Curated annotation (Swiss-Prot):
<dbReference type="InterPro" id="IPR033900">
    <property type="entry name" value="Gram_neg_porin_domain"/>
</dbReference>
<dbReference type="GO" id="GO:0016020">
    <property type="term" value="C:membrane"/>
</dbReference>
<dbReference type="InterPro" id="IPR023614">
    <property type="entry name" value="Porin_dom_sf"/>
</dbReference>
<dbReference type="GO" id="GO:0015288">
    <property type="term" value="F:porin activity"/>
</dbReference>
<keyword id="KW-0732">Signal</keyword>
<protein>
    <recommendedName>
        <fullName>Uncharacterized protein RC0098</fullName>
    </recommendedName>
</protein>
<feature type="signal peptide">
    <location>
        <begin position="1"/>
        <end position="19"/>
    </location>
</feature>
<dbReference type="Pfam" id="PF13609">
    <property type="entry name" value="Porin_4"/>
</dbReference>
Amino acid sequence: MKKLLLAASIICLASAGLAEENPTPVISNSDTEIKLEGFYLFENGYVKQDHLILFDKNVTDNRKKLGFYTEAAFAATIAKTINDVIAGAKIVLQPTTRAKTSTNYNGSHIFIETSYGKVELGSPADASAKLRITGSQVTAGTGGWSRYALLDGQYMRYNGLKSDFDTNASFYLESYSNSFDQINDKAERARRLNFFTPKMKGFQAGVSYTPDTANTGGNRDINNLTLASSGRNGVSVSKTGIKTVKLENNETMTINQNIRDAFSAGLTYEHEISEDADLKLSVTGEYGKPARRLIHAKMDGTTIQVLNTYKLSNLKAYNLGAVFTYGNFSCGASYGNLGKSLTAKEYYKVGRDTYYYNGAVAYGQGPIKTSLEYLKTSRYKNTVDAVSLATEYKIMPGLLPYAEISHFQAKGKPVYYPEAPSKTTRGTVGLIGTKLKF
């Protein structure tokens, strides 16, 4: 804890040194505008968790309980206006740390905007992600406790197989994508076509089309297979949305949860009830077909023998969300259901349904904001409960030091073994960091 307090002191001193007005840089002339924006996060995390074995206790390669985390984004938006038509491009650069992939930055894409709406070509963020409302949108801090917790450690496994858990409110089009774990991958999320209507009497709608969630726009080997002459049932070596699990007797299950012909849509409504009260509502959804089948195979030396293939169910997911603000108080809530999306009974024997709900309340007074959030997820009957208390202080516009403490509990077992005992792990994560946005 002394080390955590020391790190907090260093962060506060660094924040104070940056405390001066720093508006977003904008270069413009009569019809062309260039906007530069960026984000950087430095965070120190401390975790205490039970039932961790050997190196599972390490937050980093050589340190237990304590670790640093950084995240960054930098983007340039160039727009030109001619006869009430705005056309331009947004270019997001790859930083030398983990890239921030939130919908606020939305990745590199071309856009065209008129009075009839906005079209985005090649955007990595779909309409459901941009229009979705969750309770965490009103909170302080980052909600990043899951970066330091280990929910699928050795204690939680059975026959070497990990349990599946969800630690946030996300849909498949977002969660099954390249995660920038390697900064040299030079790949983003799948590319999409988006259309958003203009806001009319508080309403706005959006729709997206994604031909293939494995097509990130920069990758070349779209259909690279490891099995010769295996056709559509082959095992793709792409990392995007694919995992292979080892079973008994040298058998494996390769689960490709990529989607083809994926559609997502959303509808939001904003209403100013009074001078001090605002209400925002949102309904979003996703639909798509599985790109490939689940493959049951057996390893015989260097040879792979396909024993059987199984059809995965279609992607069908929706989210309902609301945010209410009254004066300095804000509260948000959401419920999401993914049903049996992209599962098959031959592997998901414990359960196939996934859902989540979360709620948060926040109070802001001047530069200080404090929030309390609760998250509940259930993925294939494996549950996660988390409560987070966070506070942040705005030193200047865009500069936010914060502190956050979260308590979590995960309970479950591997989906392939219904006979496995259900195990539980609990822990507490403390975060201290600084966010800088310009």
